[in-house]
């Protein structure tokens, strides 16, 4: 996975990616068998961890990181 700013994404992809304010955020989620390992690796790479892994009442482990533009990214275990 790569986390890029809008500027670097423009440079890498040559797409017309508009400037927006930090208030225009969204959440995207990625499912993994080992949330803790993903969060450990993200932390080692300097990624902002905004929610440590927690087991939710329904049994799913969920954590949150933020990309350089402040978008929330959910890292979660599969729903059983």
From Swiss-Prot:
Record protein name field: Uncharacterized protein YsfE
Classification via InterPro entries: Glyas_Bleomycin-R_OHBP_Dase, Glyoxalase-like_dom, VOC
Residue intervals of the VOC domain: 1-78
Pfam families tied to this protein: Glyoxalase_2
Domain of life: Bacteria
The gene coding this protein: ysfE
Species of origin: Bacillus subtilis (strain 168)
